[in-house]
């Protein structure tokens, strides 16, 4: 059997961006841009200038810095879900046409906000399946759907969708909110069992789901952890994952997406990192002071 090239995951500190190095190839990965988000606020009487240019300049800076071969975006390019707002008709094509002048390989994995995204993307931008893609030992998908079965052969699953933040109160009573990275251990047999079940693969009570995956799909199950990326658009609201006022169960139910709801991801023991790389503890130690 040929040796797989090593896959290295490097957060591009202090940005909400991840560099995936697989063999000699470099993939820059970001998630949740939500272009047109501020236009939605205008409907509520709050007027915020368009963030598109700021986000574009920031992304171009990161591309110049790390010189990736390819840019992968884990979904939620635009903000409105089904229909397309006027601002998105304008901003989404401009955003990607400018990016294509910097980098010729761009892959988009659609998120739940990306209905009809194809019509907004210029030629040259590849739209991948919602069930995700494999880059070396990393499986990438947005997080609102089940991943493709082949992603179970990756050591690390990487999703967006949740926009994780932590919130603390300082001694003066001020609230501080920071975007964070989440890296949670996975219970592999449970994840394999629930994914196979989703794809209607029949399992008897004492079947070993990992054996079935090997036998029926020729996939060696390898998933060990799941990474939740911070949103690239830092202007958005986030999900304070350390809220103590409601029970953990409620928070977990609130974690939208079938993989997080399946009970196979141990969020209690998830490691939480700030964007500058500081490890601030595991989630069960980070209750918010209220
Ligand atoms: Mn989403």
List each language-model region with its residue ranges:
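Extended recognition/assembly regions associated with phosphoester-bond processing machinery
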Residues: 1-290
């Amino acid at each position: 059997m040929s040796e797989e090239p090593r896959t290295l995951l490097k957060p591009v500190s202090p940005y909400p961006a991840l560099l995936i190095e697989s063999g000699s190839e470099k993939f820059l990965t970001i998630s949740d841009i939500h272009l047109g988000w501020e236009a939605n606020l205008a409907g509520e009487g709050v007027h915020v200038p368009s963030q598109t240019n700021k986000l574009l300049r920031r992304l171009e800076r990161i591309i110049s810095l790390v010189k990736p071969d390819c840019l992968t975006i884990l979904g939620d390019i635009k903000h409105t879900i089904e229909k397309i707002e006027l601002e998105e008709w304008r901003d989404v094509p401009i955003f990607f046409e400018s990016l294509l002048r910097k980098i010729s390989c761009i892959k988009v994995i659609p998120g739940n906000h990306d209905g009809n995204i194809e019509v907004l993307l210029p030629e040259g931008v590849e739209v991948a399946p919602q069930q995700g893609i494999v880059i070396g030992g990393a499986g990438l998908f947005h997080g609102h759907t089940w991943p493709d079965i082949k992603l179970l052969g990756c050591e690390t699953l990487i999703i967006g969708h949740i926009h994780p933040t932590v919130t603390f109160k300082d001694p003066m009573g001020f609230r501080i909110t920071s975007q964070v990275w989440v890296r949670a251990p996975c219970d592999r047999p449970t994840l394999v069992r629930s994914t196979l079940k989703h794809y209607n693969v029949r399992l008897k009570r004492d079947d070993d789901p990992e054996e079935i995956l090997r036998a029926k799909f020729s996939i060696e199950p390898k998933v060990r952890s799941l990474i939740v990326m911070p949103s690239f658009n830092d202007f958005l609201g986030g999900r304070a994952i350390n809220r103590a006022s409601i029970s953990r169960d409620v928070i977990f139910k609130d974690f939208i997406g079938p993989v997080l709801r399946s009970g196979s991801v141990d969020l209690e023991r998830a490691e939480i990192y700030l964007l500058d790389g500081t490890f601030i503890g595991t989630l069960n130690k980070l209750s918010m002071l209220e």
